[in-house]
Amino acid sequence: MLRLVYDSLTGNVRHFAETLAAELHVSPMRVQDPAPTDAYLLLTYTFGSGEVPASTRRLLTTHGHLLRGVVASGSYHWGHNFARAADVIAAEYRVPVVAKLNKGGTAADRAAVRRWLLHYAESAPPFPTSCTGEPTPWNAG
């Protein structure tokens, strides 16, 4: 199972991440916690008129290579900028947008993210592989 790493300003993403984590029997991490050392799903918010929060950027700058998907919250009233942080991060790090949440999200949103996580867990390679194709102790060739 991917680690859940979240960034929250108003508490909406925190509540979504903690509720999802409880349903999955895992412990979520905040972006302010010690950085993840394994693959993770990022749950974040959209700042201003569509920006990625600075705290999320700091995590991605050093640990973006471990990112496997992104969930972002926003508000429908922002129109085309709704949860735009998800689109920006997905494009920059070439990962899927798993979900866009209106404010705190819904039970249906949690179910969709949970399904994606379970599918990812079933289809992910069983051992680490190098992003560059170089042999590692697990895929010596």
From Swiss-Prot:
Keyword terms: Plasmid
Keyword Ubl conjugation carried by entry: no
GO biological processes: protein modification process
Molecular function, one GO term: FMN binding
Function: Probably involved in ribonucleotide reductase function.
Membership in a protein family: Belongs to the NrdI family.
UniProt cross-references to HAMAP family, sorted A to Z: NrdI
Protein's recorded name: Protein NrdI
